[in-house]
A protein has these predicted regions:
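Intrinsic-disorder/low-complexity accessory segments
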Residues: 1-3, 7-189
Length: 189
């Protein structure tokens, strides 16, 4: 017996029982997103490949987490859902070939380092889609991501921890060093 690719369906309580989830949530805010740059890059990549993405116009809650207006939603109710799902789902187990020329790349959120949530419950998707704006094309996404900015939370004139989560965070450290500021590294705790 030879197994080629194993991909479970979403069979949990309230889930759709399908190969595809209902949508993916990709936060575009600092509270819910570790790497805003990579999330914005993903929005650009998806729309460049004709995947439709939406941005929420109001806050919503999923699985106990509040997401603000401006959160990216990638619905699976579209012609390019296989493109989106191929890039975003959590991977395929291929165990039928002993040698592969190359591994397939999936789980872009893991390889590129951005936070993402999979939604497989139709009832949850119904409430999420109700707060979404119109689908964005690539030009819309470029304009939207260009307007995204970093932000600071915390006490001014105190020590700040910058997570090494993106090219932008590295660039920020380099700018601090060029300006003669003291920069240290947390090695434990």
């Amino acid at each position: 017996q030879r197994q080629m690719c194993i991909r479970d369906r979403y069979k949990g309580a309230g889930q759709n029982g399908n190969f595809y989830p209902e949508c993916y949530i990709i936060p575009l805010d600092g509270k819910n997103q570790t790497n805003l740059q990579a999330a914005a890059d993903m929005m650009e990549w998806l729309t460049r490949n004709d995947v439709k993405v939406n941005v929420t116009e109001k806050e919503f809650t999923y699985d106990g987490v509040a997401y603000p207006a401006g959160t990216m939603i990638v619905p699976m109710y579209q012609a390019k859902r296989s493109v989106a799902n191929g890039a975003l789902y959590d991977g395929t187990l291929i165990n039928g070939w002993t040698i592969l020329y190359s591994e397939g790349i999936t789980s872009f959120n893991e390889t590129r380092g951005f936070d993402m949530v999979t939604v497989a419950e139709p009832a949850a998707y119904k409430s999420i889609s109700a707060v979404c704006g119109d689908a964005m094309d690539h030009d819309d996404a470029l304009a939207y991501t260009k307007a995204l900015t970093s932000y600071f939370t915390g006490d001014k004139n105190k020590d700040v921890i910058l997570s090494n989560a993106s090219e932008d965070s590295t660039a920020a450290v380099n700018e601090l060093l060029k300006a003669g500021k003291t920069v240290g590294m947390v090695t434990s705790g």
